[in-house]
């Protein structure tokens, strides 16, 4: 703060000097070369979990939503896609726990959500889908009270304790599925009334099996699914934002989503 004892003219001059000094400081900051460095290397390097269906499936013929979007992005940027598996991604929603470094990749995918924790650590792309707990059943269910359920947690970073509390509040008897096959079998055989799992996976299972999928009630939170980038990589972020917009406008994004979610389109949010 400028002291009040300084004459008015001097205060005005000093104010201008401070403003010009700040502007000069901005111009002297190192230029963001993230996009030019990526173009120089010819690679868009992405860290993803080995498997996180339907974002990452491990199936070469249908590799997952995020893998297909990353391939399309790399093509838009005239780059080759290089994938580095990281088993920690998606096990929780805190990227600080994933031990990923800038030396490994420019983009993080396959379980990144635009939470305050993520945004304190990473830049994020626009959202192209939502995640949260979803419910799967052979037929739509209006009232969960007193029903039987099976829960498939997988490696999802969703809050399992919150789901457990919610189910108990509805007097739902539930078991934990060891894998997706047992989850589906319990629904097919009528051993349970509904299943609870991550919503993107719920959509995929419902589309494949002819079941119904719906969001869990709103007391269980939902999160925007995004790509993560390193703080300060603004030129690369702008290129990725533009690339995603092109993929959406062309209809390619909707086609990718439909292949894995039975026609339910994802929504992009800033």
Roles of regions detected by a PLM:
Residues 1-9:
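N-terminal Lys/Arg-rich, disordered targeting/topogenic segments
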Residues 12-29, 64-76, 139-158, 165, ...:
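Extended ligand-binding regions for polar small-molecule ligands
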Residues 15-16, 34-111:
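Extracytoplasmic small-molecule ligand-binding "clamshell" domains
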Residues 49-50, 127-136, 199-245, 261-270:
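Periplasmic-binding protein-like
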Residues 52-53, 89, 113-117, 141-142, ...:
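Solvent-exposed loop/turn segments at secondary-structure junctions
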Residues 56-57, 71-85, 125, 153-178, ...:
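Ligand-binding cleft/hinge of the Venus flytrap
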Residues 79, 112-116, 120-160, 164-172:
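A conserved helix-loop-strand patch within extracytoplasmic ligand-binding domains
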Residues 87-106, 121-123, 180-196, 200:
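Short helices/loops that flank or line small-molecule/ion binding pockets
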């Amino acid at each position: 703060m400028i002291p009040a004892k300084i004459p008015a003219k001097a205060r005005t001059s000093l104010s201008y000097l401070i403003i010009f000094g700040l502007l000069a400081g901005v111009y002297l900051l190192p230029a963001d070369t993230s996009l030019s460095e990526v173009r120089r290397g010819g690679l868009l390097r992405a860290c993803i979990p080995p498997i996180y269906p339907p974002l990452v499936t491990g199936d070469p013929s249908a590799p997952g939503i995020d893998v297909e979007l990353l391939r399309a992005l790399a093509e838009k940027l005239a780059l080759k896609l290089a994938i580095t598996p990281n088993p920690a991604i998606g096990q929780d929603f805190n990227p600080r726990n994933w031990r990923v470094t800038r030396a490994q990749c420019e983009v993080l995918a396959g379980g990144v959500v635009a939470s305050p924790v993520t945004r304190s650590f990473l830049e994020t792309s626009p959202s192209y889908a939502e995640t949260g707990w979803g419910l799967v059943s052979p037929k739509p269910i209006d009232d969960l009270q007193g029903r039987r359920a099976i829960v498939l947690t997988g490696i999802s970073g969703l809050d399992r304790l919150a789901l457990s509390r919610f189910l108990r509040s509805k007097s739902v008897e539930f078991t934990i599925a060891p894998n997706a096959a047992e989850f589906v079998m319990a629904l097919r055989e009528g051993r349970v009334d509904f299943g609870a799992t991550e919503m993107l996976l719920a959509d995929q299972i419902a589309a494949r099996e002819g079941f119904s999928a719906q969001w869990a009630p709103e007391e269980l939170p939902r999160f925007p699914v995004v790509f993560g980038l390193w703080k300060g990589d603004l030129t690369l972020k702008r290129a990725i934002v533009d690339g995603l917009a092109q993929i959406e406008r062309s209809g390619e994004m909707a086609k990718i989503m439909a292949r894995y979610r039975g026609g339910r389109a994802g929504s992009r949010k800033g």
